[in-house]
Amino acid sequence: MNDSVKTSLKRTLVGRVVSNKMDKTVTVLIEHRVKHPIYGKYVVRSKKYHAHDEANTYNEGDLVEIQETRPVSKTKAWTVSRLVEAARVI
């Protein structure tokens, strides 16, 4: 009767790794643009998330996709699902 394919209801976000100093954890900065309600100007809002990185493979500057999971620790309820773009080496 209900033969539909199960879809993931977990949220996914794309952001830049700003810190990888912790063991098995990266800090990801998510930026989004919001229109100011009075002035109409678009302003950039940002938020940092701690995400689980089991193999310590991601470096600062990498663009990654994070996915919501069960809480791993007090501040960590996201996991890195894939690398979107590696950091440019200067």
From Swiss-Prot:
CDD domains: Ribosomal_uS17. One of its GO terms (molecular function) is structural constituent of ribosome. One of its GO terms (cellular component) is cytosolic small ribosomal subunit. The keyword Ribosomal protein applies. One of its GO terms (biological process) is translation. Belongs to the universal ribosomal protein uS17 family. This is Small ribosomal subunit protein uS17.
